[in-house]
From Swiss-Prot:
The organism's place on the tree of life at top rank: Eukaryota
Protein name according to UniProt: Pleckstrin homology domain-containing family S member 1
Biased composition (Basic and acidic residues): 258-271
Compositional bias per record (Polar residues), positions renumbered to this chain: 159-173
Pfam (any one): PH
Region (Disordered): 159-179, 258-283
Domain PH, chain residue ranges per copy: 14-129
Family annotation (Gene3D superfamilies): Pleckstrin-homology domain (PH domain)/Phosphotyrosine-binding domain (PTB) (2.30.29.30)
């Protein structure tokens, strides 16, 4: 995009806007300047009720931000503290920052162009307002449709009955007729109220849709009677409505028939089959989210919380260990990567003398008591440690072992005074420490976070949190 020119496309191409912005990292890395990345953003229409703001790096898709009627877009940052931090890091004006708040996260985009930021915010805000207005109109139409009583007149009833049915649906004519009937018949009001109460009760009791039943046969009977010379009475609105109701039958019979058949079929199938529900969309959502129908609301909430935490039962099973390695071992055998805002172990190819110290996904907490925020800082800490030849002592602390776990077999040099006791004093030592040799001056201390969970078959295993 040369010269900072902005390209705008129509909805037919699905792409509405595109430009470069500096995107904010997750909240835990907000203060890290290196975590803010420049990305190419493309704003496209994802259906009739949402936008998709995708961002790319070197033509590779890195993620997307879903913007719907529940999202909010504004110029600047509402939090004064965050706004000051952004100004300090990037030397930008508040009008050059765009805030996008979604259901799951809050994003901040820096563009260094006030007009461009204002244009993007105005475009997305107007789209959200159109969605809300359309949704309100739809809800009003549905509410009016539920309150309105529709009458159906057969073309075989003649023009007089049709005109009466249409006239009764007109508000002005209906009010005039009602006023005249009240004056001529004193008992009209009581009868009318009874009819309304009975109709309301019928609607509450019969809340299923009605299906057509033998309409053609009914029409044939009417035609036959007209051919034989019998006169067709002109019906009022109530009589027309009653006649139409006789052409339909309730769905309750079909519903219970299908339910009985489904119960018989389900009894023949495996017991693990989920029961059929009347609301298919809700059933698919519950099944897709992995929620069991037999769980109580409290159990469902607890299960959802465990899923969000990565299947970690509680914090008491989280262990912090200190691992001591020489700089050559770290450089040659250990590979790290960034995932979900954390620094994790992607590969460990240590020799047999070191053993399987790390597992894929272990979370790096600190390097020589320094907490890195990115891979660049890890490399910086390791480089400085090698150049200064810092010496590190071997640390020992309380480590709680779950019953049946054998962590000491996974990491060489890990000992406990009693393998069956819980929360015993433990020490993480390397081979040269057990041989009573002097510790080298360039050993590195890497702190990792482990946790224990139970798999579905009940076997204990160690994974990263």
């Amino acid at each position: 995009m040369a010269g900072g020119k902005q390209f705008t496309f129509s909805y037919e191409n699905e792409v509405c806007k595109q430009d470069y912005f500096i995107k904010s990292p997750p909240s835990q890395l907000f203060s890290s300047v290196t975590s803010w990345k420049k990305r190419f953003f493309i704003l496209s229409k994802a259906g009739e009720k949402s936008f998709s703001l995708s961002y790319y790096k070197d033509h590779h898709h890195r993620g997307s931000i879903e913007i719907d009627q529940n999202s909010s877009v504004e110029v600047g940052i509402s939090s004064q503290e965050k706004m000051q931090s952004v100004q300090k890091m990037f030397k930008c004006h508040p009008d050059e920052v765009m805030s996008i708040r979604t259901t799951n996260r809050e994003y901040f985009l820096i563009g260094h162009d006030r007009e461009k930021i204002k244009d993007w915010v105005s475009f997305m805000s107007s789209f959200r307002q159109d969605i809300k207005a359309t949704q309100q109109n739809t809800e009003e139409e549905l509410s009016l449709g539920n309150k309105r009583t529709l009458f159906y007149s057969s073309p075989l009833l003649g023009p007089s009955s049709t005109s009466e049915a249409v006239g009764s649906s007109s508000p002005r004519n209906g009010l005039q007729d009602k006023h005249l009937m009240e004056q001529s018949s004193p008992g009209f009001r009581q009868t009318h109220l009874q009819d309304l109460s009975e109709a309301t009760q019928d609607v509450k009791e019969e809340n299923h849709y009605l299906t057509p039943r033998s309409v053609l046969l009914e029409l044939d009977n009417i035609i036959a009677s007209s051919d034989s010379g019998e006169s067709i009475e002109t019906d009022g609105p109530d009589q027309v409505s009653g006649r139409i109701e006789c052409h339909y039958e309730p769905m309750e019979s079909y519903f219970f028939k299908e339910t009985s058949h489904e119960s018989v079929d389900s009894s023949k199938e495996e017991p693990q089959t989920l029961p059929e529900t009347q609301d298919g969309d809700l059933h698919l959502q519950e099944q897709g989210s992995g929620i069991d129908w037999c769980l109580s609301p409290a159990d469902v909430e607890a299960q959802t919380t465990n899923d969000q935490k990565g299947n970690i039962p509680d914090e008491s099973q989280v262990e912090k260990l200190n691992v001591f390695l020489s700089p050559p071992d770290v450089i040659n055998y250990l590979a790290l990567t960034e995932a979900t805002g954390r620094i994790c172990v992607s590969q460990w190819e240590g020799p047999p003398r070191l053993g399987c110290i790390f597992c894929h996904g272990d979370h790096l907490l600190a390097v020589n008591d320094l907490k890195p925020q990115s891979l660049e800082e890890v490399s910086l800490f390791l480089t400085r440690s090698i150049q200064k030849e810092d010496s590190f002592r071997i640390l020992s602390y309380q480590v709680a072992f779950g019953e049946g776990t054998e962590l000491r077999d996974r990491a060489p040099g890990f000992r406990t005074s009693d393998r069956h006791d819980v929360a015993k004093r433990a020490c993480m030592e390397s081979d040269w420490c057990r041989d009573s040799k002097t510790a080298p001056s360039t050993n590195l201390c890497l702190s990792f976070l482990f946790c224990k969970i139970m798999t579905n078959d009940g076997a204990g295993c160690w994974i990263i949190k």
